[in-house]
UniProtKB/Swiss-Prot annotation:
Organism name: Campylobacter jejuni subsp. jejuni serotype O:23/36 (strain 81-176)
PANTHER family associated with the record: THIAZOLE SYNTHASE
Name of the gene encoding the protein in the UniProt record: thiG
Protein's UniProt keywords contain Transcription regulation: no
This enzyme's EC code(s): 2.8.1.10
Localization (cell): Cytoplasm
Record-given protein name: Thiazole synthase
Length: 258
C-alpha cells in the first residue's frame, strides 16, 4: 500500500502532480504565501489575475516559487466571453494553459453560472487551454462541461468563503459516480476534517483558500490541511469498512455462562 501511495498521481489533462492539495491565494498577505505553500506541500496554486498586476501592488508572482504550477482563474468574469478574455491575458502573462473557469454574475450568493461556464469551456478548449470549470454540483452541467472539453470538474462544497463544509456532498457523490474526470472539491471547505472527509469520498483533490488565509497561524493550518488530504486519500485507497448493522469486533463466545 505504501508503494501505491508513492505512485498515486493527480492527473489533469497532460499534467501529473504528486500533491492532491491545491492552495488558493486570494486572501493572503503576499509575505505569507511562500510559507503557506511550503507547509502545504502544494504543487498547484490558484491565481486571480487582478492580483498579478505590475502597478503599485507587489506582483504575487514574485512570491510564488518557480517550481509551483500556476492555476490562474477567470475571477471577475460575468459571462463566457469575459472568461475567454481573461484566459487570453493569463496566457500572455506566461501563466500557461491550465485555467480555472470562474463565471459568476450573481453578486449576492457568488454562485457560479453553470450555463455560461459550459460555453466558456468550449471556447477555451478550442483555443488550446486546459479548462477546469468551477461549478455548482449538477450532473447535467458536469456532463456538458466534460463534452465541451473540461479536463476536470471543480464543484463547490458550500458557498465560497462560507467554511460550511460538504453541504453538497450527495451531489458531489453523483459526479464521482458518473463523470470520468478528476473531481476537485472547491469552495466552502472550512476545516482539515472536512477536507479529509472529501478525500475519503474519492475526490481527486481539494482546493482550500479562506480556511487557511483566515487562520491565526496560516503556515500551521496549511500543514494541517496537507496532512488531512493525505490521510483522506490513504483511507480511500485502503477501502473504508461499511456495514449496515452492528457487528462485534470480538467473538461472542458465551464464556460467562460456562
Amino acid at each position: 500500500m505504501q508503494e501505491n501511495l508513492k505512485n498515486d498521481k493527480l492527473k489533469i489533462g497532460k499534467y501529473e502532480f504528486d500533491s492532491r492539495f491545491i492552495l488558493g491565494s486570494g486572501k493572503y498577505s503576499l509575505e505569507l504565501i511562500k510559507s503557506a505553500i511550503e507547509e502545504a506541500k502544494a504543487q498547484i496554486i490558484t491565481l486571480a489575475l487582478r492580483r498579478a498586476n505590475t502597478g503599485e501592488i507587489a506582483n504575487i508572482l514574485d512570491y510564488i516559487p518557480k517550481n509551483i504550477t500556476l492555476l490562474p482563474n477567470t475571477s471577475g468574469a460575468r459571462n463566457a466571453d469575459e472568461a475567454l478574455r481573461i484566459a487570453r491575458l493569463s496566457r500572455e502573462l506566461g501563466c500557461g494553459e491550465l485555467i480555472k473557469i470562474e463565471v459568476i454574475s450573481d453578486s449576492r450568493y457568488l454562485l457560479p453560472d453553470n450555463y455560461e461556464t459550459i460555453k466558456a469551456c468550449e471556447l477555451l478548449a478550442k483555443e488550446g487551454f486546459t479548462p477546469l470549470p468551477y461549478m455548482h454540483a449538477d450532473l447535467y452541467a458536469a456532463r456538458a462541461m466534460r463534452d465541451a472539453g473540461a479536463a476536470a470538474i471543480m464543484p463547490l462544497a458550500a458557498p465560497i468563503g462560507s467554511n460550511k463544509g460538504l453541504c453538497a456532498k450527495e451531489f458531489i457523490q453523483i459526479l464521482l459516480n458518473e463523470i470520468d474526470l478528476p473531481i476537485i472539491v472547491d469552495a466552502g471547505i472550512g476545516s482539515p476534517s472536512q477536507a479529509c472527509e472529501a478525500m475519503q469520498m474519492g475526490v481527486s483533490a481539494v482546493m482550500v483558500n479562506t480556511a487557511i488565509a483566515e487562520a491565526k497561524d496560516i503556515a500551521l493550518m496549511a500543514k494541517a490541511f496537507s496532512l488531512a488530504v493525505n490521510a483522506g486519500r490513504a483511507a480511500f485507497l485502503a477501502g473504508l469498512a461499511s456495514v449496515s448493522k452492528a457487528k462485534a469486533s470480538s467473538p461472542l463466545t458465551g464464556f460467562l455462562r460456562d
